[in-house]
C-alpha cells in the first residue's frame, strides 16, 4: 500500500475526527459531515493518500446522514472487509491504496448497482472539476 504517511504525520496533518475515522475505524455523527450536501461536480479522494475513490455523478441522497455513492471509480479503489462489530454483520470499505477506513457498503442502493457506499465525510477530500478547489471533509 503506497503513499501512506507515517502515524506521526497523520496525527499532525489530520483533525481529531479525521484521524479517529480513518485510523481507528470510527464513525462521524450523522448529518455533520462537511461533504454531505456537496453538489458540485468533481472527484472524491481519500483524505489520507489522495487516491480517487468516487465520482460526483455517483453520489446521491440516501437520507442516512453520510455521503452515499452507488459505485467507486474503479474496482481497485476500494478494499472490502467483513465487519462483525457492534453486533452487526456489515462490509467495511477502506481505501484500496492506503487502507484508510472510509465507511461501509450496503445492498440497498439505487440502480445500476443496487449498492450504497456509506462514507464518512471525514475520510474524504473533494476536488471541484470547475476550478480545482479542494474541500476536505
UniProtKB/Swiss-Prot annotation:
The keyword Translocase does not apply. GO terms for molecular function: peptide-methionine (R)-S-oxide reductase activity; zinc ion binding. Disulfide bonds: none annotated. Zn(2+) binds at residues 46, 49, 95, 98. InterPro entries: Met_Sox_Rdtase_MsrB, Met_Sox_Rdtase_MsrB_dom, Mss4-like_sf. Its cofactor is Zn(2+). Keywords: Metal-binding, Oxidoreductase, Zinc. It catalyses: L-methionyl-[protein] + [thioredoxin]-disulfide + H2O = L-methionyl-(R)-S-oxide-[protein] + [thioredoxin]-dithiol. Its EC number is 1.8.4.12. GO terms for biological process: protein repair; response to oxidative stress. Gene3D superfamilies: Peptide methionine sulfoxide reductase. This is Peptide methionine sulfoxide reductase MsrB.
Amino acid at each position: 500500500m503506497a503513499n501512506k504517511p507515517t502515524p506521526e504525520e497523520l496525527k499532525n496533518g489530520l483533525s481529531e475526527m479525521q484521524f479517529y475515522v480513518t485510523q481507528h475505524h470510527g464513525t462521524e455523527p450523522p448529518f455533520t459531515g462537511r461533504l454531505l450536501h456537496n453538489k458540485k461536480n468533481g472527484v472524491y479522494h481519500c483524505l489520507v493518500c489522495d487516491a480517487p475513490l468516487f465520482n460526483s455523478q455517483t453520489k446521491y441522497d440516501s437520507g442516512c446522514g453520510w455521503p452515499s455513492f452507488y459505485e467507486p471509480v474503479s474496482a481497485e479503489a476500494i478494499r472490502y472487509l467483513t465487519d462483525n462489530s457492534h453486533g452487526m454483520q456489515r462490509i467495511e470499505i477502506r481505501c484500496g491504496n492506503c487502507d484508510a477506513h472510509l465507511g461501509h457498503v450496503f445492498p440497498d442502493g439505487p440502480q445500476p448497482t443496487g449498492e450504497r457506499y456509506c462514507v464518512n465525510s471525514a475520510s474524504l477530500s473533494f476536488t471541484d472539476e470547475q476550478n480545482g478547489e479542494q474541500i476536505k471533509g
